[in-house]
């Protein structure tokens, strides 16, 4: 354990920090493909009973009309957060037609052709058209298949009551906004160093439908006539078949300070990329993408974690960060766990909080370019070979056995877990960490290990396994588990969102061509 972290633990057991530890803020965003009863992608429009995908705060769509995204509010109570996610699932399943299901896996269901994937529609307003055009740009740049891979986004922040005592204990005398930003970047750098461990512990995509790799280079093996896999893989979603952009490969995004991070993104958003220029912004008056730059907008940059801030109307994310600093971080490295009805559970959240707190409070030197690519190499190795007991990673240019390193990190995270248990008067955090330690000792206990074991023992293809789990969760959740008050609230929220979308559409005063030009010039 680092000396800095040891000193932190002593300081943070003081009474002035007690309230802060109990008020850690988190929220969950969960993507799920909407599929037919037989496990194929739904081609129908977003159900009206779920409201407007533009304005419903709980239920929206991601890339596709068929790719639902469920969003919880921010909670300091883990059980309340999970209960809301459960309510959203139950309400959604009760309002899907023709026995449609939510696909439990991160890797998609079988597809006859990627062109069949319906791109998300957000209505006739300029902001709605912009969102749809952005997705057309993603489709034209990367293909639609990559865009319907699903995952969990975990949003994490420390409460306001934490920051002033923390700044005082560090001897910081400046603007608290700058201190918070500095420490969130501190967390992000450490997260990048150790995120391979989350991929090992929670990766749940060791296999994919064979059709997913059609006309794509890959090093996967054939498990059966319909399934490709890698024997020791953990998370193909984060590998060459998953979220990957050759155009972004050379981007060195610096998290040493906020200005460098924002400057890198802005440069990418203002630098024409030859391949996208050749494609053109439009053909015969039909738009193909927002612009021809390396990034159409900030969110196109693929990363396992992002610094975030709630934006004001009409504000760019990079502008919000520059003006007001980092408000929270968004972890984007998590697969859907097909054994869990909501893709994540409270045990995993307890561990994530301990892990992220460790990243925040431990020493975090600035990251240089050599380390940046070393970290990327470690992640790639764990994605493809994480359950190989002999796998070694690189630490400052030297090989280190992954299992040994993982055990060392968990031993340090245990200190954060013990602190949180001390404050909460519980054993939940230490228990969640103990559950992860067993996975280090036995790779078959990881989600990826369990999935391959169950597929092989059951003689199941990836498709058959995923359909089986999807049906199980659908049937369990369709049972009446919603209170009348919750049903009423969800239905009223959906209805209000449709009115809100109509109001937005009625307020537009300029044509989309002018709107897009002004947006690109901003």
State what each model feature region is:
Residues 27, 83, 87, 129, ...:
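Generic recognition of stable, solvent-exposed alpha-helical segments in well-folded globular domains
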């Amino acid at each position: 354990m680092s000396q800095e972290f040891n000193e932190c633990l002593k300081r943070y057991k003081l009474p002035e920090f007690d309230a802060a530890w109990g008020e850690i803020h988190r929220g969950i965003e969960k993507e799920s493909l909407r599929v037919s009863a037989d496990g194929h992608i739904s081609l129908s429009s977003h159900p009206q009973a779920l409201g407007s995908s533009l304005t419903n705060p709980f239920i929206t769509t991601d890339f596709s009309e068929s790719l639902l995204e469920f969003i919880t509010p921010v909670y300091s109570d883990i059980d309340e957060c999970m209960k809301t996610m459960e309510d959203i699932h139950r309400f959604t399943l009760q309002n899907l037609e023709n026995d449609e299901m939510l696909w439990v896996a991160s890797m998609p269901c079988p597809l006859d052709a990627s062109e069949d994937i319906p791109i998300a529609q957000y209505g006739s307003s300029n902001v709605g058209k912009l969102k749809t055009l952005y997705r057309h740009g993603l489709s034209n740049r990367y293909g639609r298949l990559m865009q319907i891979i699903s995952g969990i986004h975990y949003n994490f922040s420390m409460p306001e009551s934490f920051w002033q005592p923390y700044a005082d204990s560090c001897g910081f005398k400046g603007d608290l906004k700058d201190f918070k930003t500095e420490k969130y970047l501190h967390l992000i750098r450490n997260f990048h160093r150790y995120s391979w461990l989350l991929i090992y512990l929670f990766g749940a995509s060791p296999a994919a439908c064979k059709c997913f790799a059609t006309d794509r280079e890959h090093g996967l093996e054939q498990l059966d006539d319909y399934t490709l896999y890698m024997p020791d893989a953990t998370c193909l979603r984060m590998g060459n078949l998953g979220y990957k952009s050759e155009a972004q490969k050379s981007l060195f995004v610096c998290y040493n300070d906020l200005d460098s991070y924002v400057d890198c993104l802005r440069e990418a958003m203002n630098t024409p990329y030859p391949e996208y220029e050749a494609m053109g912004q439009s053909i015969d008056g039909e738009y193909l993408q927002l612009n021809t730059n390396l990034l159409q907008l900030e969110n196109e940059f693929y990363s396992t974690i992002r610094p975030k801030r709630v934006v004001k109307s009409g504000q760019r994310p990079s502008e919000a960060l520059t003006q007001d600093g980092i408000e929270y971080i968004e972890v984007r490295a998590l697969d859907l766990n097909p054994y869990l009805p909501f893709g994540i559970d409270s045990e995993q959240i307890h561990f994530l909080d301990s892990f992220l707190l460790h990243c925040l409070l431990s020493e975090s030197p600035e990251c240089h370019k050599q380390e940046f690519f070393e970290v990327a190499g470690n992640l790639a190795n764990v994605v493809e070979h994480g359950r190989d007991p002999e796998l070694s990673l690189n630490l400052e240019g030297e090989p280190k056995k992954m299992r040994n390193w993982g055990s060392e990190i968990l031993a340090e995270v245990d200190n954060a877990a013990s602190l949180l248990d001390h404050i909460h008067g519980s054993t939940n955090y230490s228990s969640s960490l103990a559950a992860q330690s067993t996975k280090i000792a036995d790779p078959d206990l990881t989600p990826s290990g369990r999935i391959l074991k169950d597929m092989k023992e059951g003689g199941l293809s990836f498709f058959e396994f995923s359909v089986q789990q999807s049906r199980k969760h659908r049937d369990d959740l369709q049972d009446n588990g919603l209170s009348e008050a919750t049903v009423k609230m969800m239905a009223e929220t959906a209805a209000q969102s449709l009115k809100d979308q109509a109001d937005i559409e009625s307020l537009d005063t300029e044509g989309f061509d002018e709107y897009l030009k002004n947006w690109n010039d901003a």
